[in-house]
Amino acid sequence: MGMIVNLYRGYENEHSKSEFLKNADSADIFKIMMGMTYEQFKYQNLAWTIQNFCRNYHILIGSPNINREKIIDINQITDELFGLNVDELLAVEMMILWLCSQNPSPLTASEKLYNRSETGVITKEAIEKVVGYYSVTYKDVRNSPIGKQIFYSKPFVKTDKTQENIMVSFYLLAMTFADGLYWLMRDYYRNNNWGQKFINAFGEMFEDYFEELADTYLDEKQWFKIPVQNKKSADYYVEFDNAILLFELKSGLLGIGAKQQVPDIQQIDTFYKRNILEAYEQLKNSEEEFQGEKQILKIFLLYESATNMQIIMASIPDIFINDKGCYIMTIEDLEMLLATYRNDREKFNKVIYTLLNNENSEGRCESVLKVLGDYDAIGDMHFIGERDYYTNILERFKNCFR
């Protein structure tokens, strides 16, 4: 750890005027590494994109157990923006993905490649509308407060000279497909000055999804929502044979400026404050309330999709080094954990035992994902069968050519 700190300080002394690195301790270095690895880990394995797509589709459209009364029907939004319903939009987006796998300029492709039916929705006009929505100009990029990170939401650039829409990166296009439904709604609300309404409503929908998962994998007597009291508490209580898990749910996402090679430290600090530091006392209060014979694990459950939680934990040592029973878990981690509980109880018990007896220390933290991986308890476990929306949409896409 000391070597990493010294290398960073040496680089900073030669190349940077940043005061942050001049005074960085090991926790600060991990904070910087969190931003760097967040971006790199996403690029190294795109399997997460299918899971994210299915989860977003399930919460915003697919599940009958999610209360969507506080949000606008997403089909209304896609019709207003593109003249398409959601499934038609997704079919068009799949075609754009395929076209871009052949050529980075999809609008130059012959319409004969994709429009093979008089009643089909995959038309040149539809593709132009969707590509146009996800495009920016050079000027947009230059003036963007988040710089090149704008390509995460707008993965096409429209050239000045030829007015051609060119894909910046296939990885970024795939990422846009994965999270596109969520950001389509969130951006629509923001553009109409209703941004906080969607964020608040989605937080409640995230709770609905947690309860749906609990109903799917657990006995009804194993879990409950902790009643709101004068003393702030965690959100949910879940009991197993060998442990109690307390969950504090956080649907807020890490700012895009924090997810890059030179991360915005202020955005990281804001995310930590809102989603971890302020919520820690709530988990502690509930731990005191439910203290008994069984050991307790305190879980910050994030909707944020990330595979570098061990680095985030190492960057907040006051909590995750000093409190051995505290973890950050992504919603995908929870899906795999609960599926393992139902499918392989012995494997599940080993995971819980390891989490209860962790030996986190400065510079070394084990995440829930790492422990799940150690016991071969990872994979596409939840979004299968009727919940495999990606395959279902893909079949509809194929039908356009039959």
Language-model segments: what does each one mean?
Residues 226-228, 233-234, 260-262, 311-316:
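Composition- and surface-driven signal marking solvent-exposed, interaction-prone regions
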Residues 203, 207, 229, 240, ...:
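Active-site-proximal structural scaffolding
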Residues 215-239:
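A short acidic/basic microdomain associated with nuclease active sites
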Residues 2-219, 312-402:
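Interfaces and regulatory segments of ATP-dependent nucleotide/adenylate/phosphodiester-chemistry enzymes
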Residues 214, 236-238, 243-251:
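Conserved catalytic cores of phosphodiester-cleaving nucleases, focusing on short active-site segments
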Residues 253-254, 305-309:
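Short acidic, S/G/P-rich loop/turn micro-motifs used as interaction or catalytic elements
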Residues 226-227, 301-305:
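Short His-Asn-centered micro-motif
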Residues 251-301:
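Catalytic cores of nucleic-acid endonucleases
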